[in-house]
Amino acid sequence: MQYGAHIYIFTDRWADDQLHLLDTMHGLGLDLAELSVGDDVHFTPAKTRQRAQELGLTLTVGPGGAWPLPCDLSADDPAERAAGLAWHQRQVDLAAELSAVAYAGALYGHPGVVKRRRPPAGEYAWTAEGLHALAEYAAVRNVRIVLEPMSHFRTHLVNTARQLMELIDLADHPNLWALFDTYHLITEERDYAAAIRTLAPRLWCVHTCENDRGAPGGGLVPWASLFDSLCEVGFDGPLVMEAYNSSIGAAPGDFAYSRGMFHNVCPDGAEFVRTGLEFLRSQVASRWHS
């Protein structure tokens, strides 16, 4: 089992002068660092790749930075879908430069775009077509494409495990994988164990945070059911904590507010990781190694 954390637990934007954070993450006992990329994120991939390799840290990337709205694989307009494919391909190129093992997120659409309408008959089909092309492009570069269902407050396209598997089946490519996010799906799935079983053939990663996006443990997430089912299906992929540091920004807390997090659940990134790791390891130790 690998344990990871999103870089947003420590900083609002990855850059060359943030390399020391990889040392911090390694020192906390993490095996994986998830970086956010986008049009406003600028760094030297070779420097990040080298430091991660020196530390033995696995890298993954996701599109958490600036992502133009007209770049959307699910858009009604074919030109926007083509622009979306080209944009994601550039992020895959960056992932390959980093030797990152995955490009992950709600890549099927554009997070934050929620179309309150009856879905057009062809929406899943044309989205699947774009995902197939992206998965093929990434496979040549040894980068997994990992798709994440999100809350209906963030997307109208894929809110449940069943919907994600339907889309993956339509896209029909072996380089498409699934990510289960305990925070996003607390409003979408009544039975986490059933959702894990649904995703099992493609499940690669689990984002592990509480229902308030705080450190895992003590909230509403049904952790016992989640970990029982993960053990049942033989999951051995990354468990990754994801949150927004609530002490950083132009003024302390500005970053979290800018990401829509209005309560102080991650004032100290290192403490967040320590608390979360202790909980996650205890859940794994009581099942996988019993």
Predicted features and spans:
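Histidine-acidic metal/acid-base catalytic patches
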Residues: M1-G4, I9-T11, D16-H26, S99-V101, ...
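Helix C-cap/helix->beta junction micro-motif
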Residues: E54-L59, L98, V140-R141, P174, ...
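Structural motif corresponding to the early beta-alpha repeats
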Residues: D31, L35-A128, V240-A250, S286
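Short, flexible loop segments at the rims of nucleotide/cofactor-binding pockets, characterized by
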Residues: F10-D12, V37-G38, R81, E123, ...
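A short, flexible beta-alpha/helix-coil linker loop
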Residues: F10, P68-P70, H110-V113, S151-F153, ...
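Active-site acidic/histidine proton-transfer and metal-coordination neighborhood
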Residues: D77-W177, H263, P267-E271
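Short loop/edge segments at beta-strand edges and connector loops
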Residues: D39, L147, F180
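Catalytic-core regions built around general acid/base machinery
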Residues: A46-G56, G130-A138, A195-T198, S225-L230
